[in-house]
Amino acid sequence: MASGVFGTPISAQTVIATGEYKEPITQKDVADYAMKMINAGGKDVNAQKFVDNLKERYGNGIAVKCLLYNATGATLNFAKYNDWHGHIYDTPYPSDIQNGQWGAFLHVHPSGAAAGSAGAVVYRSKIPSSSSSCDWLFSWTVPYIGGNGVYTEIREEGHYPSVGSWDYIYNVKLKNSSVTSIDSNYGYVSKADIGEGTTMNARGVFEFPY
């Protein structure tokens, strides 16, 4: 299993084996079962331990424990990232998060600077019943002074940063964000939340609900 990814992928075959869904199995069926299994097999606990251990190795300072869950019924492929303040620590962004898996990473503030952690990551998936793809944005800010915030949205493939510029996301969206964010597009739903303090979880759940 790739670094920073937790849980056994949930496929159509997984769903058929449960006997809970009528065939033919659809993407929504696979996504629905993944949502039901969000904490199955200790994968959520293992993802949390992973970021907790990264933070322990990192030491003192502002650090954001990022946890992303895929319940889209499709694979999320890493597309791009942006750092406004700080950087990812020790392990890369997960390259692929399959349906039913958690992805995890730690983002930390710039060393020796009076600045917090602020970043964004974009994952790409197929649009349901289409050959086209869409981009999922998950972004967070933990300023040196001020409140924490998250912002998420779903847009067309290649939206970032040519249409949704990083300056716009940071100065208009993140700076006016709260501790929760939700967006829907293409039938998908993206939900994000962040804790308080200088070391906390920032969580994103990407869904394809009925």
From Swiss-Prot:
Organism domain of life: Eukaryota
Any one Pfam family match given in the protein's UniProt record, by short name: Nakanori
Regulation: induction: By jasmonate.
InterPro entries in alphabetical order: Jasmonate-induced_protein, Nakanori
Similarity comment: Belongs to the jasmonate-induced protein family.
Protein name (Swiss-Prot/TrEMBL): 23 kDa jasmonate-induced protein
Organism: Hordeum vulgare
